[in-house]
């Protein structure tokens, strides 16, 4: 796999669009408004960070260790933050709610890591 980040963002984008379509057309009559709101929030953050990983993966910074930390943090953050919101929407145990802020923290780590990596980069 030459660029694993491109493969992962392609899959993330696919699942984001698929779940969004399923939520809009198949779940809107089944789930309560609160559950649909959790799905919408998860989708919003998933797509936003998928695009962020894509941008960094295609940039000159992609081989910078802090940029790689950013992309990894965002991808794991998607799994934890968005994934926990999806699970809550489908009535998973409320214990999973404690995973959501860990994913959000990983999003923040990714952004500050990218800022630091770009600041310290001599090639930009």
Swiss-Prot record:
It is found in: Cell membrane. It is a multi-pass membrane protein. The chain crosses the membrane at residues 6-26, 70-90, 95-115. Keywords: Cell membrane, Membrane, Transmembrane, Transmembrane helix. GO terms for cellular component: plasma membrane. InterPro entries: DUF423. It comes from the Bacteria. Its main location: membrane. Signal peptide: none annotated. Belongs to the UPF0382 family. This is UPF0382 membrane protein HI_1073. It comes from Haemophilus influenzae (strain ATCC 51907 / DSM 11121 / KW20 / Rd). The lineage of its organism: Bacteria, Pseudomonadati, Pseudomonadota, Gammaproteobacteria, Pasteurellales.
């Amino acid at each position: 796999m030459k660029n694993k980040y491109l493969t992962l963002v392609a899959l993330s984008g696919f699942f984001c669009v698929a779940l969004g379509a399923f939520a809009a057309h198949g779940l809107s009559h089944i789930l309560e408004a609160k559950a649909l709101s959790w799905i919408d929030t998860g989708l919003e953050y998933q797509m936003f960070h998928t695009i962020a990983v894509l941008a960094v993966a295609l940039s000159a910074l992609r081989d910078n260790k802090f940029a790689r930390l950013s992309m990894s943090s965002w991808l794991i953050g998607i799994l934890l933050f968005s994934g926990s919101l999806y699970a809550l929407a489908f009535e998973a145990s409320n214990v999973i709610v404690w995973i959501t802020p860990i994913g959000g923290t990983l999003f923040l780590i990714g952004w500050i890591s990218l800022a630091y990596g770009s600041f310290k980069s001599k090639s930009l």
